[in-house]
Amino acid sequence: MDIPTVPRQITVHLGAPNANAENITLPFNEYIKNVASSEIYPTWPKEAIIANILAQISFTLNRIYTEYYRSRGYDFDITSTTQYDHAFKKNGEIFSNISQTVDEIFNNYIVRDGNIEPLFAQFCDGVRTRCNGLSQWGSVELANSGMTALEILKSYYGDNISLVTDAPVGENIPSYPGTPLSRGDFGEEVYRIKIQLNRIGKNYPAIPEIPYTNAAFDAPTEEAVKTFQRIFNLTPDGIVGKSTWYKIKEIYAGVKQLSELTGEGLTISEAQRVYPRALVPGTAAEAVR
């Protein structure tokens, strides 16, 4: 998993995940404007509006970063139903002050100190429903008492959070490399798979530990992949095709609790690219040590 970026576009499913509903793709900032205009009121104090929008951005980026839906076989990034995600209304009204605020902060998001994934910033209205995250109406009271947006967020998510500001914007590219990985392959993707399988193995000890976490798809890697595939009812061929790739990603995100408010999280060292380019036989030895 790479360092997070803010996608230029997002695909929204207009219904529950399994519902036969339309998918629409739109610019990320336009999506957040729609969500914010559907979830909160433009008459709220500015700091409450900012706090709520930051929570909405962070929640959305967490869904995209973990490929929560795509790793489960869906062809969208998020749904439009509050049972699973945010409120979103196709062609919904956008309030001007909310639109302006989103344009100012759409590439800012919340992180837990020491972690790099966007916080799974749950929220609820605080009146009809309650949750462990931000209370929308409660944020209004806190803003009226003089709190800043960050102070409001810390009051709900804990003091050990901070904001990433001016995050890079890029394309929303699926993580699957496009071709299956198998014994004899080299590269960053192989390295990531080995790291992830070793972490998954702490929760599923039947998966043998891979002793050398470098960029080579070797025999121990193949055996670990086969065991993983058996556990999760995939064809145990030792090849990391699309279904195995995304199942590994799904289970890794689960054991790391990346889509929970208080999870293990992902450190920057776990997300940095170790091998900046694809490796092929004959690559200089320094790059594969």
Stretch-by-stretch model annotation:
Residues M1-R289:
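Conserved, single-site charged/polar hotspot
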